[in-house]
Swiss-Prot record:
<dbReference type="InterPro" id="IPR003598">
    <property type="entry name" value="Ig_sub2"/>
</dbReference>
<feature type="modified residue" description="Phosphotyrosine">
    <location>
        <position position="190"/>
    </location>
</feature>
<dbReference type="InterPro" id="IPR007110">
    <property type="entry name" value="Ig-like_dom"/>
</dbReference>
<feature type="region of interest" description="NUMB-binding region">
    <location>
        <begin position="166"/>
        <end position="183"/>
    </location>
</feature>
<keyword id="KW-0812">Transmembrane</keyword>
<keyword id="KW-1133">Transmembrane helix</keyword>
<dbReference type="GO" id="GO:0045059">
    <property type="term" value="P:positive thymic T cell selection"/>
</dbReference>
<keyword id="KW-0393">Immunoglobulin domain</keyword>
<dbReference type="InterPro" id="IPR003110">
    <property type="entry name" value="Phos_immunorcpt_sig_ITAM"/>
</dbReference>
<keyword id="KW-1064">Adaptive immunity</keyword>
<comment type="function">
    <text>Part of the TCR-CD3 complex present on T-lymphocyte cell surface that plays an essential role in adaptive immune response. When antigen presenting cells (APCs) activate T-cell receptor (TCR), TCR-mediated signals are transmitted across the cell membrane by the CD3 chains CD3D, CD3E, CD3G and CD3Z. All CD3 chains contain immunoreceptor tyrosine-based activation motifs (ITAMs) in their cytoplasmic domain. Upon TCR engagement, these motifs become phosphorylated by Src family protein tyrosine kinases LCK and FYN, resulting in the activation of downstream signaling pathways.</text>
</comment>
<feature type="region of interest" description="Proline-rich sequence">
    <location>
        <begin position="170"/>
        <end position="177"/>
    </location>
</feature>
<comment type="subunit">
    <text>The TCR-CD3 complex is composed of a CD3D/CD3E and a CD3G/CD3E heterodimers that preferentially associate with TCRalpha and TCRbeta, respectively, to form TCRalpha/CD3E/CD3G and TCRbeta/CD3G/CD3E trimers. In turn, the hexamer interacts with CD3Z homodimer to form the TCR-CD3 complex. Alternatively, TCRalpha and TCRbeta can be replaced by TCRgamma and TCRdelta. Interacts with CD6. Interacts (via Proline-rich sequence) with NCK1; the interaction is ligand dependent but independent of tyrosine kinase activation.</text>
</comment>
<dbReference type="GO" id="GO:0004888">
    <property type="term" value="F:transmembrane signaling receptor activity"/>
</dbReference>
<feature type="domain" description="ITAM">
    <location>
        <begin position="169"/>
        <end position="196"/>
    </location>
</feature>
<keyword id="KW-0391">Immunity</keyword>
<keyword id="KW-0732">Signal</keyword>
Length: 198
């Protein structure tokens, strides 16, 4: 199959999928226009019925019990999760399955709550990371400068416990006659070690 033909088939397929998806969206628009609107502010919850009242009152029910409100909005002040949670329904005229809209509501509210948007949360996180990195660099440079000002400590060497480097405080030890090196001109008992002829 040639590349030009492949592109034409792909374009035709994409157009048919887009047209098919648009038909489904037309039916979805009818459904999405009939959704409840829920507004929460502090301890106040307001439900808005998706039905338009054409000359009639809107009836509200909670868990199959009628509520006294006949307006489009149901205002629940001092909302309590235990008392006010449940199935809410609204309808115009007589109740039947075609004109009844049902919503299950379970909300948590508080008086002193504060809503924080995404930019505020992101700026708090960025500021926290910057402060942490600043403190890390401060401690690093402080410890580096402190280490440079300190005198080097001499540590004891292996078996003798003598310092490894030249010690300026005491002179080198006096040579012990038991361990003096063998003189070149003198021929002693051990002066010929490791000098075997091979």
């Amino acid at each position: 199959m040639r590349a030009g033909t492949l592109w034409r088939v792909l374009a035709l397929w994409l157009l048919s999928v887009a047209a098919w998806g648009q038909e489904d969206d037309d039916h979805a628009d009818d459904y999405t226009q009939k959704l409840f609107t829920v507004s929460i502010s502090g301890t106040r919850v307001v439900l808005t019925c998706p039905v338009e009242a054409e000359g009639g009152d809107i009836h509200w029910e909670r868990d199959e019990k009628s509520l006294p409100n006949t307006k489009k909005e149901l205002d629940l002040t001092d909302f309590s999760e235990m008392e006010h949670s449940g199935y809410y329904s609204c309808y115009v005229g007589t109740k039947n399955k075609e004109n009844e809209h049902i919503l299950y509501l379970k909300a948590r509210v508080c008086e002193a709550c504060m809503e924080v948007d995404l930019t505020t949360v992101a700026s708090i996180v960025v500021a926290d990371v910057c402060v942490t990195l600043g403190l890390l660099l401060l401690v690093y440079y402080w410890s580096k400068n402190r280490k440079a000002k300190c005198k080097p400590v001499t540590r004891g060497a292996g078996a003798g416990g003598r310092p490894r480097g030249q010690n300026k405080e005491r002179p080198p030890p006096v040579p012990n006659p038991d361990y003096e090196p063998i003189r070149k001109g003198q021929r002693d008992l051990y002066s010929g070690l490791n000098q075997r002829g091979i």
